[in-house]
């Protein structure tokens, strides 16, 4: 995928995630699973880490995994703060931040294992 398109897609996903985190969610369908919102947070921020990793790799950034993880964590913190400051319909939740970090960690571990396996196969 051309890196400009990948960069644009990454920015769009980041924006989409921010908007979905700040708008009223009562119009969204509810899932009857305990802590389903925490799974959604883990998935969303794991994906955020992945798309930033792929984008940074396409630009040949050293330590792309560390930087993409950092971007995703900081973005999650900013969104949680904005939920408390900008909206009346959303509230910041430390457990959401923990779920975000869990998703980021899972994706980072998978990427690390994949990268080490690829190097050994050469």
Residue ranges and their predicted role:
Residues 1-95, 101-122:
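Bulky hydrophobic segments
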């Amino acid at each position: 995928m051309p890196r400009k398109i990948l960069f644009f897609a990454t920015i769009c996903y980041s924006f989409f995630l921010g908007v979905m985190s700040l708008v009223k969610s009562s119009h969204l369908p509810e899932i009857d699973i305990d802590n389903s919102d925490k799974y959604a947070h883990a998935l969303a921020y794991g994906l955020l880490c992945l798309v930033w990793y792929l984008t940074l790799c396409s630009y040949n950034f050293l330590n792309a995994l560390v930087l993409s993880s950092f971007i995703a964590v900081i973005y999650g913190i900013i969104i949680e703060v904005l939920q408390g400051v900008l909206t009346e319909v959303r509230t910041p939740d430390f457990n959401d931040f923990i779920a975000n970090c869990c998703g980021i960690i899972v994706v980072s571990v998978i990427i690390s294992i994949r990268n080490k396996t690829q190097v050994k196969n050469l």
